[in-house]
Amino acid sequence: MQAKKRYLILFSAGVCLILLFYLQGPASRRTPKRGDDPHPHWPHFSDPLRAFIPWDQTETEDYNVRASPRHKRDDSTGADKCRMDSCFDFELCKRNGFKVYVYPQQKGEKISESYQNILSSIEGSRFYTSDPGQACLFVLNLDTLDRDQLSPQYVHNLKTKIQNLNLWNNGRNHLIFNLYSGTWPDYTEDLGFDIGQAMLAKASISTESFRPNFDISIPLFSKDHPRTGGERGFLKYNTIPPFRKYMLVFKGKRYLTGIGSDTRNALYHIHNAEDVVLLTTCKHGKDWQKHKDARCDKDNAEYDRYDYKEMLHNSTFCLVPRGRRLGSFRFLEALQAACVPVMLSNGWELPFSEIIDWRTAAVIGDERLLLQIPSTVRSIHQDRILSLRQQTQFLWEAYFSSVEKIVLTTLEIIQDRVLQHSAHSTLMWNRLPGGLFTLPQYSSYLGDFPFFYALLGIKPHQKFTAVIHAVTPLVSQSQPIFKLLVAVAKSQFCAQIMVLWNCDKPLPSKHRWPATSVPVIVIEGESKVMSSRFLPYENIITDAVLSLDEDTVLSTTEVDFAFTVWQSFPERIVGYPARSHFWDSNKERWGYTSKWTNDYSMVLTGAAFYHRYYNYLYTHYLPGSLKGLVDQLSNCEDILMNFLVSAVTKMPPIKVTQKKQYKETMMGQTSRASRWADPDHFAQRQTCMNKFASWFGTMPLVHSQMRLDPVLFRDQVSILRKKYRDIERL
């Protein structure tokens, strides 16, 4: 019996061995030997840090190792792999520079107000061209902003309409704007038509679908967002320490089900109703009562007790969680309110991430670490909070306060990609006054701009160039222009004098001009218009420009003192004749006044210093319509320059000394200079004020009550102790 058991055990073991042989043998035989592989792979050594690679990058790592260069090149031609070098024709931009063409609007085609604002911003910019043959970039006349099929703004048959455009060319060199994509319940990023090789300027775009250095992430903005100008940030003054009533706030919808519900449903875990106030409501949508949970009634009641604006303006940090889509209106609201955004939207490509360093203006959180958010924001030092808060105001006013700024920033980014040799530096984008006012075509060296002297630790040039605008023929040696030439030339800081001859009479011979110790360059322009005084002449080799009218009366001491003051404020206009603006509530328009009051908002360029960069900005940034108005009226060029400089700096000009009269009163009445006594001249300046304010979208001029006088000015001390003693006698 025992023998039978032993034989049975041996038989069973043999059967098992045979089964194992047949199961493993074919598998081992199917595995080719190392020398038999017809397509051997490159050896792939395991990465000891592979466990720390984010899950969404592992496929990319394998692709880079396994795929051949030809395979990668073939894949890059797909729409989802587009880059500037593969899906953009640079040849179109070499002929006429960076110009943008907007397709003409078709009859019967509805366009939303937001998309019309986008198109109007492009058409009013310096990039616009009405000739498609000159264009480098094309923008559709079809509204692509809202691609939610449930939206009343949804445009049907868009695919067919786009394919019928004769310049479409599979989207090459085209830019498509989009705010909303996808619909309930998935809210995918599908636009409902094939974008081909077009670039996307899209809100709520994910890092997964974002094509780096090709697409542009823009902020989600409402239909009420202003087209131009926009409100300034709400930060009026800095408080030390920078803490406010609340540490962290949020007020918004709570999605009970579906995408975006996880984070908002969990906010109650960190809400303490004291310094962390995170409020949600279930009252939205048609079927919210069907899905309401046990917390809804309590959440709804608490939600109604708090005022959102009061919370927004009195909180140090503002939570910006994702909604149904990755982007949220709360983002721009927090920026404007100087409430540091705490981003809680994993996978969102932040707006203009290509140029903006968001670490300087926001706290980037992680939805998976929601419970750590309160301790994280509490640990941020107050110096850091103050810096973050100030940067929110800069970014809001520079890039986000209007539709126009969002659109122009988008176009500037694309221009930087096209004209890489003259692209903005990261510093230009992230420091005052921002990339829209710092044109790299002027210079690639930051030291040539008046905004970066302190940052670079340098000073402006120690000399200035005087530019005298002459419109009256030389008749007598007693004319004010001769006295002015002599007085300015005696300044120890004067490098040269330029005379812009805008007179109808022929240019005087050289012997008619007085002898001076500095070079006098006389330039006769081809088009003798008012804007020519602000052209960026190559002859101007100094940073400072002293702009003068031909009938200005200044002494050498006054010139020296004004230049000394300008050296401390090189980004502002510094000079003598002050004017002001006011709001006329009866006429509901802006007014211009030359009355001597206790404040001012303009310093006229008839006797003022400014940086030569503003000549370049005046010529290349301002639209032809404004400069055309100035040339047509032969008036208002000084007001326009003040508008421009104040829009850039957000600060007023600086008046020096108490001098009020700066014009020669004995000019002949037949002279063009006598236009100042013409009543129509003053009325024209009122019109200019409102035309300029309309284009800027706001009133950029800032009032000031500051006047700078020399040390010991009018003090009862010995005249020998005063450096600018002659000023007191004038």
From Swiss-Prot:
State the membrane topology: Single-pass type II membrane protein
Record's keyword annotation contains Glycoprotein: yes
Positions of Mn(2+) binding:
551
**What is the main EC category here?**
transferase
The coenzyme or cofactor needed here is: Mn(2+)
Q: What Gene Ontology cellular-component terms does the record carry?
A: endoplasmic reticulum membrane; Golgi apparatus
Task: Enumerate the UniProt keywords alphabetically.
Answer: Disulfide bond, Endoplasmic reticulum, Glycoprotein, Glycosyltransferase, Manganese, Membrane, Metal-binding, Signal-anchor, Transferase, Transmembrane, Transmembrane helix
Disulfide bonds listed in the record:
636-688
Q: Could you list which ranges are Lumenal topological domains?
A: 28-730
Q: What is its EC number?
A: 2.4.1.224, 2.4.1.225
Q: Where in the cell is it found?
A: Endoplasmic reticulum membrane
Sequence ranges on the Cytoplasmic membrane side:
1-6
A GO molecular function assigned to this protein is: glucuronosyl-N-acetylglucosaminyl-proteoglycan 4-alpha-N-acetylglucosaminyltransferase activity
Family matches, as Pfam families: Exostosin_GT47, Glyco_transf_64
Q: Which residues are glycosylated?
A: 314
Please give the biological process terms from Gene Ontology that the record holds. Answer: heparan sulfate proteoglycan biosynthetic process; protein glycosylation
Q: Where does UDP-N-acetyl-alpha-D-glucosamine bind?
A: 533, 549-551, 637-638, 685
Q: Where are the transmembrane segments?
A: 7-27
What is the similarity comment for this entry? Belongs to the glycosyltransferase 47 family.
PANTHER family xrefs: ACETYLGLUCOSAMINYLTRANSFERASE, EXOSTOSIN GLYCOSYLTRANSFERASE 1
Protein name stated in the entry? Exostosin-1a
Q: Which organism is it from?
A: Danio rerio (Zebrafish)
